[in-house]
Amino acid sequence: GVEVFSMDKLPEIKDIERLNSMIHMIRMNKRVSKILDCYIQKEHVKVYPDTKELPELLLEMSKKLHESGFISDTKGFYEDVLLREKNYPTNLGSQMMVPHALFTFADKTGIEVALLKKTFEHHGNQVQLVFLLALEKKRNDEMNLLFQFFNQIVSHKKYMHQLLQSEDSDAFIKNLYSFKLLE
C-alpha cells in the first residue's frame, strides 16, 4: 500500500517533524526489505516440529552454512559460536537469539534461521527462534540495520507472535515481510 499523510492546514513544526519521521521510516522499511531479500532466503529457513537442544541445532545450522559456501571451517565456527553463547549469550527478548561467532569470520555473510515449535531453555529463556549469523570480517551498515531490525522484532509482540506461528518456511518468509516499523 501507499503511505498517506494528510494535513488540513499549513503544516506546523510538529507536522513537519511527523512527516520527516514517516519518510525516514519508509526509507528504513525499504532498506530492511532489501537486506532481508539479500540475506534471508526461504531455503535457509527450517521449521522444527520436535524438541532440539541448542548444541545439536547450532551444529546442524553450521553445516548448512558450510554447504551453502558461507563458512569454510564448520567445526571451528560451531565451537566459536558455542563458546560465545556460554560466555556472552545472544538472547534478544525471551524467545529469540542471534548467535554468531566471536573470532571466526565467514567467507561471505549468510544467515540460517530455525523456528522451533517446541521451545528449548537457554539462559533462563524459552527460545523458539534462532537466527545464526555468519559474518564477514568487514562489518557494514547493513548488518547494523539488521541488528536494529532484530531488536525491533522482539519489541513487537504481535509481529513476533505471527512469526512464531509460521507453519513452514513459506509462511515464515511471508510473515517476516509483514513488518512495518511504523507501528
Name what the model sees in each region.
Residues 1-183:
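Cytosolic covalent-transfer regions centered on His/Cys nucleophiles
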